[in-house]
């Protein structure tokens, strides 16, 4: 298959994905003897198109599953999408509002038709984006959280938890969105710092003897106050506990109670208790059996309990109430105060802590089981490990979970109320005498259904489902650290509760994609980046490699066009290296193993050794999900070792007359390039398929090719030392040429004073490389080379590299250069000495590491002595 002179991602990627899908390459293996590897995609919301965070998330998943497929696993990467209750409903309502229509105008059934239309439209966008990213998904198993099968799972879980007493209906403080008129989960509340005020009021004692000072940021809620609390250890208030105060405006008597929740050092040390409008106040109210007085309605307007403020918006009420208190001389002071205020992620409304009758999941036992499971062999491994502490901490302090939502789009709660008796019936099927019952109109929190995602997508609750039996539990979950609480934790406790097993073995957590300046990407800042635009410009492979290798697990990623472009340059380098290799391999070249009986050159042995080292490194790091380090290892090997050195060195035999040596070089080129493509494939699926198809190969696609394996027979340790010596000499000569302004095209005499006879022999045997890369007019390699008085000398591991300078150099400049080199070597010696004199390092570091530092010291000392001697020689 022909490779064009220039890498064009559009040409390379066009039609490739469709071919993979059509040929069924992403379907699980029919060989059931294989070990399985499963990842279920974190389902994107059908609210819109995918962003860079989704691209990062799914790229990591695809890399893992492609690699596991190549390693011989029966691999399933299962796609799906989330109905995203409030988020999607808000989008659909906004679209209707543009036409002057509300959901109530349409009614529930017609509105849901509109929502399903929205889902179908955006699901097709998402699939197209998955395709452009090259995700190896098995579309025959695609799931949606409102699918019939998943709905069945949701109903079963709800009913089972209700029958166990874990799900209950009750009154609690929830996050209330007065604009969308629904309860919200914590993740749907965005906290923002807002400029507000601290209002300090007088609450007069009922006996007329003075007042107690109370501070609040929400004066409108004081209309629902039912007590004042102070800390029992606060000496200031010991004598007033048990007394009463008069609630301003309302006139209701409030008891002063003792509760250790109160912070003695905060404010006046006394706080008002409004159980119906604050979570902490509600819990205090429960302890002291206080009345719950709700003073607002579901629209955020004051109700009949607010007296003369009835019908006012809550914020208008705040202003008027403060003015009224000023008139009564009950305002002590008003302080400017910046505080965190929750806003609805969807509507933008200020969220109201609100006492409401909702459905809840009792979390104590579920959380305990999740924590206990982490102490067993069935534990889940977190990457990075520090996030296990985050998970444990949340589970230890968990509150009951509000699962009902006042929406239409979602799983309607499978509970019915008898029209006459009020009896509650909960079941997977509706009551037989349905005419006597009214179903609960609320739907379940989106996270309730997505918490079942790892097993509901595989056929559960049908325990005989082939997919469930074969592919559950899944192997890895890849997701952002920002949803450990809201999704990861819930999948864990639901998986344990309903399957008695962890839902996944590993959790790989990544951070957020940020703008280059570190700020969060957002529409309001206008700094968002559409991944599809990046793909159109640079190709999917460039974006994927950047996303995968640009960060380490658990850390945020800063998007950089410059870095994506540098990956594009890297792919161009690979492309050009592949074209050279293919042109020299020839069309008729057959797939052959490396002939170890043949005369492998130093370059051949070295590149094969470095290849095997890279295979080992990449495999090991990938198993630890250290893809940033994988990227560095691949880049260094491909760019430096293969393209810059081996390809150039291979031109020596390829331009020579030794046909046997040419054939060996072709074999090594082909073998190395083939293995490079296999290692790169999970990261860059498109360009590697294109190049691999052009190489001599077996099989239909690189997707199904085997992962490279380390071959001990192709590791030649001694080649590394020799190559290191040659490369250092070549770099030294080139650097010296630059310093004396002598181009590489100009032949100059070069002398190499070898450190010993063994090195002299080795360098002489490999002088062809020195001739090619250094372009000498004469090359003299010997242990007893005489160094001319006027010469440029570089001290290297192998000895000294000497360029006679007669007519080439200014002596004063050369002395200055050597003195700078001497200072640099002294700095390195000081660094190594400091390390080796550090008792902590010497006692803890492996012996191999310590010996390496000692070797470095010896090398630096030898270089230092040589440079110093040369300076003295020139000065003499």
UniProtKB/Swiss-Prot annotation:
Key words of the record: Aminoacyl-tRNA synthetase, ATP-binding, Coiled coil, Cytoplasm, Ligase, Nucleotide-binding, Protein biosynthesis
Alphabetized InterPro entries for the sequence: aa-tRNA-synth_I_CS, aa-tRNA-synth_Ia, Anticodon_Ia_Val, M/V/L/I-tRNA-synth_anticd-bd, Rossmann-like_a/b/a_fold, tRNA-bd_arm, tRNAsynth_Ia_anticodon-bd, Val-tRNA_synth_C_sf
Pfam families tied to this protein: Anticodon_1 (PF08264), tRNA-synt_1 (PF00133), Val_tRNA-synt_C (PF10458)
Classification via Gene3D superfamilies: HUPs, Isoleucyl-tRNA Synthetase, Domain 1, Valyl-tRNA synthetase, C-terminal domain, Valyl/Leucyl/Isoleucyl-tRNA synthetase, editing domain
Annotated residues for binding of ATP: 523
Keyword Coiled coil (UniProt): yes
Catalytic activity line of the entry: tRNA(Val) + L-valine + ATP = L-valyl-tRNA(Val) + AMP + diphosphate
Superkingdom in the source lineage: Bacteria
E.C. numbers: 6.1.1.9
Keyword presence, Lyase: no
GO-annotated biological processes: valyl-tRNA aminoacylation
Motif 'HIGH' region per record, residues: 44-54
GO cellular component, one term: cytosol
Subcellular location: Cytoplasm
Listed CDD domains: Anticodon_Ia_Val, ValRS_core
Coiled coil (UniProt feature): 805-876
Motif 'KMSKS' region location, chain numbering: 520-524
SS bond list: none
HAMAP family according to UniProt: Val_tRNA_synth_type1
Function field: Catalyzes the attachment of valine to tRNA(Val). As ValRS can inadvertently accommodate and process structurally similar amino acids such as threonine, to avoid such errors, it has a 'posttransfer' editing activity that hydrolyzes mischarged Thr-tRNA(Val) in a tRNA-dependent manner.
Family to which this protein belongs: Belongs to the class-I aminoacyl-tRNA synthetase family. ValS type 1 subfamily.
Description of its domains: ValRS has two distinct active sites: one for aminoacylation and one for editing. The misactivated threonine is translocated from the active site to the editing site. The C-terminal coiled-coil domain is crucial for aminoacylation activity.
Subunit structure: Monomer.
Name of the protein: Valine--tRNA ligase
Species lineage: Bacteria, Bacillati, Bacillota, Bacilli, Bacillales
Gene: valS
């Amino acid at each position: 298959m022909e490779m064009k002179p220039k890498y064009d991602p559009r040409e390379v990627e066009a039609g490739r994905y469709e071919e993979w899908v059509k040929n069924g390459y992403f379907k699980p293996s029919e060989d059931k003897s294989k070990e399985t590897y499963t990842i279920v995609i974190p389902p994107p919301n059908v609210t819109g198109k995918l962003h860079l965070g989704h691209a990062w998330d799914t790229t990591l998943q695809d890399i893992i599953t492609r690699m596991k497929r190549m390693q011989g696993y029966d691999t399933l990467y299962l796609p799906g999408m989330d109905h995203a209750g409030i988020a999607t409903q808000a989008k659909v309502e906004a679209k209707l509002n543009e036409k002057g229509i509300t959901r109530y105008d349409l009614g529930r059934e017609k509105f849901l038709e509109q929502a399903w239309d929205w889902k179908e439209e955006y699901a097709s966008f998402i699939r197209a984006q998955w395709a452009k990213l090259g995700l190896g998904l098995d579309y025959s198993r695609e799931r949606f959280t409102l699918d019939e099968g998943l709905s069945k799972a949701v109903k079963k879980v709800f009913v089972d938890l209700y029958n166990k007493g874990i799900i209950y209906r009750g009154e609690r403080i929830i996050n209330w969105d007065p604009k969308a008129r629904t309860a919200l989960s914590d993740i749907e509340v965005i906290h923002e710092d807002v400029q507000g005020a601290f209002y300090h009021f007088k609450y007069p004692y009922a006996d007329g003897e003075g007042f107690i000072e109370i501070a609040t940021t929400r004066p409108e809620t004081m209309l629902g106050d039912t007590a004042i609390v102070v800390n029992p250890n606060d000496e200031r208030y010991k004598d007033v506990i048990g007394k009463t105060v008069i609630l301003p405006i309302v006139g209701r008597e409030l008891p002063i109670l003792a509760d250790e929740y109160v912070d003695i050092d905060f404010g006046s040390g006394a706080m008002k208790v409004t159980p119906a409008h604050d979570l902490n106040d509600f819990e205090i109210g429960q302890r002291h059996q206080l009345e719950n007085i709700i003073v607002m309605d579901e629209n955020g307007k004051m109700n009949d309990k607010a007296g003369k403020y009835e019908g006012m918006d809550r914020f208008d009420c705040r202003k008027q109430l403060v003015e009224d208190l000023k008139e009564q001389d009950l305002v002590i002071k008003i302080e400017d105060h910046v505080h965190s205020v929750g806003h609805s992620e969807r509507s933008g409304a200020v969220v109201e802590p609100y006492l409401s009758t909702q459905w809840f999941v009792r979390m104590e036992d579920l959380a305990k089981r999740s924590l206990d499971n982490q102490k067993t062999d069935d534990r889940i491994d977190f990457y990075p490990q520090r996030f296990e502490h985050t998970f444990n901490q949340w589970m230890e302090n968990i509150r009951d979970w509000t699962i009902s939502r006042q929406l239409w789009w979602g799983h309607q709660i499978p509970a019915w109320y008898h029209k006459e008796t009020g009896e509650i019936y909960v079941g997977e099927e509706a009551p037989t005498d349905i005419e006597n019952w009214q179903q609960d109109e609320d739907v379940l929190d989106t996270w309730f259904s997505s918490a079942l995602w790892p097993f509901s997508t595989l056929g559960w609750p049908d325990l005989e489902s082939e997919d469930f039996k074969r592919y559950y539990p899944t192997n890895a979950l890849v997701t952002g650290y920002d949803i450990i609480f809201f999704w990861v934790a819930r999948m864990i406790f639901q998986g344990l509760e309903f399957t008695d097993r962890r839902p996944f073995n590993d959790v790989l957590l990544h951070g957020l994609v940020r703008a280059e300046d570190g700020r969060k990407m957002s529409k309001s800042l206008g700094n968002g980046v559409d991944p599809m635009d990046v793909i159109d410009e640079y190709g999917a492979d460039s974006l994927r490699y950047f996303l995968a290798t640009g960060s380490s697990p658990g850390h945020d990623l800063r998007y950089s066009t410059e870095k994506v472009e540098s990956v594009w340059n890297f792919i161009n380098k690979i492309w050009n290296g592949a074209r050279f290799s293919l042109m020299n391999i020839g069309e008729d070249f057959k797939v052959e193993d490396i002939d170890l009986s043949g005369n492998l050159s130093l370059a051949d042995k070295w590149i094969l050794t470095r290849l095997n080292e890279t295979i080992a490194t990449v495999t090991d790091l990938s198993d630890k999900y250290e893809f940033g380090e994988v990227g560095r290892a691949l880049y260094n090997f491909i760019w430096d070792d293969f393209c810059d050195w081996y390809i150039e060195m291979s031109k020596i035999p390829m331009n020579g007359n030794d046909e046997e040596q040419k054939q060996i070089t072709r074999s090594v080129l082909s073998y190395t390039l083939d293995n490079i493509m296999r290692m790169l494939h999970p990261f860059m699926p498109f360009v590697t398929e294109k190049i691999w198809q052009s190489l001599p190969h077996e099989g239909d696609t690189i997707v199904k090719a085997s992962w490279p394996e380390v071959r001990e027979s192709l590791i030649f340790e001694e080649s590394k030392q020799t190559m290191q010596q040659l490369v250092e000499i070549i770099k030294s000569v080139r650097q010296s040429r630059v310093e004396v302004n002598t181009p590489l095209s100009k032949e100059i005499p070069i002398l190499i004073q070898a450190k010993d006879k063994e090195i002299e022999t080795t360098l002489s045997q490999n002088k062809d490389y020195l001739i090619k890369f250094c372009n000498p007019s004469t090359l003299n390699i010997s242990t007893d080379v005489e160094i001319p008085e006027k010469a440029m000398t570089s001290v290297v591991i192998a000895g000294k590299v000497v360029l006679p300078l007669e007519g080439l150099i200014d002596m004063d400049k050369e002395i200055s250069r050597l003195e700078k080199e001497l200072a640099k070597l002294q700095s390195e010696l000081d660094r190594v000495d400091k390390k080796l004199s550090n008792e902590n390092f010497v006692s803890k570091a492996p012996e191999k590491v310590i010996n390496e530092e000692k070797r470095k010291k010896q090398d630096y000392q030898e270089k230092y002595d040589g440079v110093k001697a040369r300076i003295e020689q020139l000065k003499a």
